[in-house]
Design a protein with these regions (language model features):
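Short glycine-rich or small-residue beta-strand-to-loop segments that form or flank ligand, phosphate
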Residues: 28-29, 53-54, 195-196, 228-230
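A generic structural signal for alpha->beta connector loops
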Residues: 151, 193, 221-222
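Glycine-rich Rossmann-fold phosphate-binding loop(s) that bind the pyrophosphate
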Residues: 136-137, 177, 234
């Protein structure tokens, strides 16, 4: 059972609306309490992308600052967070300071008179990175089929598609193979993606890039295009080329997370 299935209908509707709008959110669940606390294990809240509580309840205001900080960390790193909001004297007994992490737990000070401890698990839900595959070539079809298993939101489009800006990560693979290459590049460059890859030889891209810059394309953006697309695995068949491209995309996505 997923967290959304354990929430009320109102909360589930809010989750669905956030997903439809490609907005990040997080579930916060109290998993353990010690001493006197307002909220008990099992209490849940839905957190917005700024870390504030949209719906639900986690007790009084003593834990809100720690929850917000942990939620922002979860969104930035795409990793769940476990926080323990603990009275200062208990932190001293444990030999940890507020703000430090030990054993996978981030500790925060609870200054409330109740002197209780609340452990809260925060699980982020981020929009899947978008993979836009331009063209209907065999490589394009193989890439769409293979990438579906690797947590990408896939869009298979024609070369003349209008790519609207998006807040999520976007990777564009141009696999038009001579059928509207320039049109596809103009659409891809205008959308400001995290990466543009071109399925074609470096010689062919050199000719296309000159045409693009002569027509007014930003030289820096053109030079940032990865051509030929994919890691060098001596790929020959469309499936092998698609595999090399997907490996490069996964490497790029993981590198982006490691930088935060």
């Amino acid at each position: 059972m997923t967290p959304a299935e354990m929430l009320s209908r109102e909360l589930t509707e809010k989750v669905d609306a956030l997903r439809a709008a490609d907005k990040p959110f997080a579930f916060a669940t109290i998993v353990r309490t010690v001493g006197s606390t307002a909220a008990k294990p099992g209490a849940k809240a839905l957190l917005a992308e700024d870390g504030t509580i949209l719906e639900g309840w986690l007790g009084g205001g003593c834990a809100r600052g720690a929850v917000k900080r942990a939620a922002l960390t979860a969104f930035r790193t795409a990793e769940p967070q476990l926080i323990s909001v603990t009275p200062e004297e208990f932190l001293a007994e444990l030999g940890v300071e507020a703000g430090t992490q030990h054993g996978g737990v981030t500790y925060a000070r609870n200054g409330c008179p109740s002197k209780g401890t609340v452990d809260i698990f925060i699980e982020p839900s981020l929009p899947l990175p978008e993979l836009v595959v331009m063209g209907a070539s065999p490589v394009a079809k193989a890439l769409c089929s293979l990438a579906a298993q690797f947590q990408f939101a896939i869009r298979a489009v024609e070369a003349d598609v209008d790519l609207l800006p998006t807040s999520r990560q976007r990777y564009v693979v141009i696999a038009t193979q001579g059928q509207g290459d320039i049109v596809a590049f103009n659409a891809a460059l205008a959308s400001g993606p995290s990466l543009i890859s071109f399925v074609g030889s470096s010689r062919k891209f050199a000719a296309l890039s000159q045409k693009l810059m002569d027509a007014g394309a930003d030289p820096a953006a053109v030079r940032s295009v990865k051509a030929p697309a994919g890691l060098n695995i001596n790929a020959v068949t469309p499936d092998e080329i698609a595999l090399s491209i997907l490996a490069e995309l996964v490497k790029q996505r993981r590198a982006a997370r490691a930088e935060v």
